[in-house]
Amino acid sequence: MPKPTKGPRLGGSSSHQKALLANLATSLFEHGRIKTTEPKARALRPYAEKLITHAKKGALHNRREVLKKIRDKDVVHTLFAEIGPFFADREGGYTRIIKVEPRKGDNAPMAVIELVREKTVTSEADRARRVKASQAASQDAPSEPQAAEEPAAEEAVAATEAVAAPADAEATDAEAGSADADADEAPQN
């Protein structure tokens, strides 16, 4: 049983709201981004995302469901041929709303709603993370026999650094002394 939406209606009546959302969605799919008032953009977002989800499925039944809401066959074709396959690997979040400056005439809060055209990096990041984990796992297995040799090597490096540290300190002191001598020779005004 159809139930009316909660809250105030855009345009006054529910039929006008349905027509308004259908026209806004048509413009969004046709142009990729539209500028409208903020309440209209917020109402359009779930409406458009449900239509994109239908387009991702791509079946005839889904096309007919979308045609019930969007009457422009060219836009529906674009939705199913281009927009749906583009978002095939994305789980929701197909649109973004960006607030812009208020409208000049009546100071109404305005927003730009647009289709997100950037690919997500999460799939690439997950793949890179899996590759890195598998490489780390393959390196950990043969490194266990070498673990006993590493502490001895680290002690030798530490001893070498301890001998080199006093020599470095003496060189630093010599450089500081020459800088002081240069400062004494400089003419003072």
From Swiss-Prot:
One Pfam family in the UniProt entry: Ribosomal_L17
Q: Which GO terms describe its cellular component?
A: cytosolic large ribosomal subunit
Biased composition (Low complexity) is annotated at 139-180
| Molecular function GO terms recorded | structural constituent of ribosome
Q: Which residues form the signal peptide?
A: none
Q: Does the keyword Ribonucleoprotein apply?
A: yes
Q: Which PROSITE patterns match?
A: RIBOSOMAL_L17 (PS01167)
For the region Disordered, give the residue spans. 126-189
Q: Which domain of life is it from?
A: Bacteria
Keywords for the protein's UniProt record, in alphabetical order: Ribonucleoprotein, Ribosomal protein
Q: Does the keyword Glycoprotein apply?
A: no
Q: Name one GO biological process term.
A: translation
What the record says about family reads: Belongs to the bacterial ribosomal protein bL17 family.
Q: How does it assemble?
A: Part of the 50S ribosomal subunit. Contacts protein L32.
**Name of the protein described by the UniProt record:** Large ribosomal subunit protein bL17
Q: What is the lineage of its organism?
A: Bacteria, Bacillati, Actinomycetota, Actinomycetes, Mycobacteriales
